[in-house]
Amino acid sequence: MAFVVGLTGGIASGKTTIANMFAELGATIIDADIVARQVVTKGSPLFLKIVQHFGQQVLTTQGELNRAQLRQLIFANQVEKNWLNNLLHPAIRREMLIQLRQARGPYVLFVVPLLIENKLIEFCQRVLVIDVYPEVQLARALTRDRSNIATIRGIMASQVNRLTRLSYANDIIENNLPLAESLERLQMQVQQLHQYYLTLATQQE
């Protein structure tokens, strides 16, 4: 099995941006958000179950899953949220582990918002936390996702709090500033961590 670094952080912490920097250096990326889209592609078994359960209201005009609409629905209703999580989380976990077994490259970056909550941390040799203040998360998510503030607060409440997440961290990248102001520092940190992970991966072989 490859050397695995779990990359996690709350909503709008910059996980994808930083994961892409690692990818450019040669790390293999397995991203839970991408896998979550793959398992509900139009016509797939899970897609059909979701449409059957929630109805046409969760579809776009192109007949694909409207993830924003679905998110609004479930965060207002704990029963529906549990139903969807019980359907999706095992499927996402299975697919991520399949991709992990097939992974090639010096090491794997396991990009998972709910790494701790869904106990995927057990597959990681190291945990990298992208750390952001809650007020920064909220402001970014409001701008990026165009969701209402209640929905975003609901997402944040469903994730472990900042201090709990940090308690699991082996490595931390602080990402509170706008990208234009912090890009050079982030790239340097990623480069240093990449070299460190290469060394650890070699030692594991």
Swiss-Prot record:
It is an enzyme of class 2 (transferase). The keyword Transmembrane helix does not apply. One of its GO terms (biological process) is coenzyme A biosynthetic process. Its main location: cytoplasm. GO terms for molecular function: ATP binding; dephospho-CoA kinase activity. Pathway: Cofactor biosynthesis; coenzyme A biosynthesis; CoA from (R)-pantothenate: step 5/5. This is Dephospho-CoA kinase. The lineage of its organism: Bacteria, Pseudomonadati, Pseudomonadota, Gammaproteobacteria, Pasteurellales.
